[in-house]
Design a protein with these regions (language model features):
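Nudix hydrolase/Nudix homology domain
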Residues: 1-73, 131-135, 197-234
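Short acidic-hydrophobic surface loop/beta-edge motif
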Residues: 16-21, 91-93, 110-112, 174-175
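Active-site-adjacent beta-strand/loop module that shapes the phosphate/pyrophosphate-binding cleft
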Residues: 28, 173-196
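Acidic, metal-coordinating catalytic segment for phosphate/diphosphate chemistry
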Residues: 59-109
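N-terminal strand-loop-strand
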Residues: 87-136, 141, 163-164, 187-189
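Active-site proximal loops enriched in glycine and acidic residues that flank catalytic Cys/His/Asp
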Residues: 126-127, 139, 168-173, 189, ...
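The catalytic Nudix box helix
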Residues: 136-171, 185, 193
Length: 234
């Protein structure tokens, strides 16, 4: 489908063209939602995970991130002049020459498990900002001057009061809500009692494989980490 074939969606604002491998993707911002157009439906980015393949979902996510970034970088943060696109993923201020690139907010997420004579269990928590009543994993944003490993240990300590050991990298995932990168880890319980950070968490505790609460959707790295642990017990 070409941009020219979508003229019936106008008015729109053309933002940029992405070149990813052999793909050329046009990023546009519609002036108003599409309604009652045969064969087309407006769908939120999160819902597209169940519709698109992984490759196309990542393309859509990158497009959404750039739309957000374009909206928030229309003016130079140094001199206040309007910015102009320099490449397909960067801008430049024509007055002071400052170059602007998308900033990614890095966050960690960690699966903590412990082994007891009764078997294996996983630490799951419910954050107050969750929109649904599921339990996820300890997570938090990387702070200036921190390593990823230091961030994991700090977030676990602040949110749960626990000590961990055997910290291992698991995987990472772009998280375009609006411009994040989730870096996943696994760790073993090393000591302490669970004391939840009440400002951020409403519930939390240890769960076994046969006593699991609702967990996040498959689109998230949290679910990948949890499913990996569940599969180890099969």
């Amino acid at each position: 489908m070409t941009l020219e074939s979508l003229t019936f969606l106008q008015p729109w604002n053309f933002v940029t063209t992405l070149h990813i491998g052999d793909d050329e993707v046009k990023i546009i911002r519609l002036e108003k939602p599409v309604s009652e157009v045969e064969g087309l439906q407006m769908v939120g980015l999160r819902k597209t995970y169940a519709i698109l393949n992984e490759h196309d979902y990542q393309l859509a996510g990158k497009g959404a991130e750039l739309l957000y970034w374009d909206q928030t970088t229309r003016y130079c943060g140094c001199c206040g002049s309007p910015t102009r696109w320099m490449t397909d993923i960067s801008k430049r201020c024509p007055e002071c020459g400052k170059e602007w690139w998308p900033s990614v907010s890095t966050a960690i997420i960690v699966r903590i498990t412990r082994e007891t004579p009764d078997g294996s269990s996983i630490l799951l928590v419910h954050a107050k900002n969750f929109r649904r009543p599921y339990h996820g994993l300890v997570a938090g944003f990387l702070e200036t001057g921190e390593s990823l490993e230091q961030c994991v240990e700090r977030e676990v300590r602040e949110e749960t009061g626990l000590q961990i050991k055997n910290l291992r990298y698991f995987a990472s995932q772009p998280w375009p809500y609006p411009f994040g990168l989730m870096v996943g880890f696994t760790a073993d319980y090393a000591g302490g009692e669970v004391h939840l950070q009440k400002e951020e968490l409403s519930q939390g505790g240890w769960f076994t494989r046969n006593n699991m609460p609702p967990i996040p959707d498959k689109a998230s790295i949290a679910r990948q980490l949890i499913d990996d642990w569940l599969e180890q017990g099969e």
